[in-house]
Amino acid sequence: YDLSKNCRLRGGICYIGKCPRRFFRSGSCSRGNVCCLRFG
């Protein structure tokens, strides 16, 4: 099961560590990355 693909399908981006400004964490991606979605 590809968490990274699932993240992108929801319009998110995978980041290492924490999400950048104007993004919020919404789950995980592969290899410990986090799925970040844009506010708004």
Swiss-Prot record:
Q: Where mainly located?
A: secreted
Compartment(s) where it occurs, according to its Swiss-Prot or TrEMBL record: Secreted; Membrane
- Superkingdom, according to UniProt? Eukaryota
Keyword set includes Cell cycle: no
For the biological process aspect of GO, one term held by this record is: defense response to bacterium
Q: Name one GO molecular function term.
A: identical protein binding
Record PTM Glycine amide, positions in chain = 40
> Which Gene Ontology cellular component terms are annotated?
membrane; microvesicle
Signal sequence extent: none
**Keywords annotated in UniProt:** Amidation, Antibiotic, Antimicrobial, Defensin, Disulfide bond, Membrane, Secreted
Q: Which Pfam families match?
A: Defensin_beta (PF00711)
Q: Name the InterPro entries on file.
A: Defensin_beta-like
S-S pairs: 7-35, 14-29, 19-36
Q: Which family does it belong to?
A: Belongs to the beta-defensin family.
Instruction: Fill in the subunit field for this protein.
Output: Monomer. Homodimer.
Annotated function: Has antimicrobial activity against the Gram-positive bacteria methicillin-resistant S.aureus ATCC 33591 and L.monocytogenes EGD, the Gram-negative bacterium E.coli ML53p and the yeast C.albicans 820. Has no hemolytic activity towards human erythrocytes.
The protein's name in its UniProt record: Beta-defensin 1
- Natural source organism: Emys orbicularis (European pond turtle)
